[in-house]
């Protein structure tokens, strides 16, 4: 099942419009190229609608907001909806400031998202309209564990029903859900959290997967999350004694580039609920 999702990305080479943060924009572009898609980064109000119209999907990331990019996100999102293009929201650090919360909630009100991807703290803030995050990281009290898994799955399904979006809660244990079905993914490596941008890269890559698999956004998101986790594992195994987090980031991108469908199917560790 996952193999087909990856092969569809490689076979169609979807052009993805990214309105993302300037911390990880280069990594997002490279991960899109590595997975078989093509990136374009455009956030000026004067061109976002035009750029969105020539793309297959839209990735919105609120990591470094300003007044201009907020308006650009709304314009691009509405244009993508008009054209029935998939749209993903990455609510980076949504609980860290009033501006982020207000922006994310306004986006949810005015744009229909195909996927919403974030850590558990970010998704809770979106769903509840309040709360805090540890900067852009999940609060330790929110971590998804086996003894809280059922509650988080039900929470994700409920939020999916409310928004109409696939909800991807990522961390040590990943949960991908729509209102009726969920997948729990156990791929990845803890050291991925030591790299700034693995979540942003995952959102960009997920935009490619859902754009190449428009009829199956849940399974496309599952494939993307599994792919990123597997590549995190493979990249970690390549590290030498003197390699650090910069080398690890580059190896992850390399592994995404080299990942094939058979490897994805064989190495993916997930259960359905």
From Swiss-Prot:
Gene3D superfamilies: 3.40.1190.20
Binding-site list for substrate: 41, 197
Domain of life: Bacteria
Catalysis performed (reactions): 5-(2-hydroxyethyl)-4-methylthiazole + ATP = 4-methyl-5-(2-phosphooxyethyl)-thiazole + ADP + H(+)
Enzyme nomenclature, EC number: 2.7.1.50
Keyword Transmembrane: no
Residues engaged in binding ATP: 117, 170
Record pathway: Cofactor biosynthesis; thiamine diphosphate biosynthesis; 4-methyl-5-(2-phosphoethyl)-thiazole from 5-(2-hydroxyethyl)-4-methylthiazole: step 1/1
UniProt entry keywords in alphabetical sequence: ATP-binding, Kinase, Magnesium, Metal-binding, Nucleotide-binding, Thiamine biosynthesis, Transferase
GO biological process, alphabetically ordered: thiamine biosynthetic process; thiamine diphosphate biosynthetic process
The keyword Cell division belongs to this UniProt entry's keyword annotation: no
GO molecular function term, any single one: hydroxyethylthiazole kinase activity
Cofactor(s) this protein cannot do without: Mg(2+)
Purpose: Catalyzes the phosphorylation of the hydroxyl group of 4-methyl-5-beta-hydroxyethylthiazole (THZ).
NCBIfam families referenced in this protein's UniProt entry, alphabetically: PRK09355.1
UniProt family annotation: Belongs to the Thz kinase family.
Identification of the protein by name: Hydroxyethylthiazole kinase
Organism of origin: Clostridium acetobutylicum (strain ATCC 824 / DSM 792 / JCM 1419 / IAM 19013 / LMG 5710 / NBRC 13948 / NRRL B-527 / VKM B-1787 / 2291 / W)
Lineage: Bacteria, Bacillati, Bacillota, Clostridia, Eubacteriales
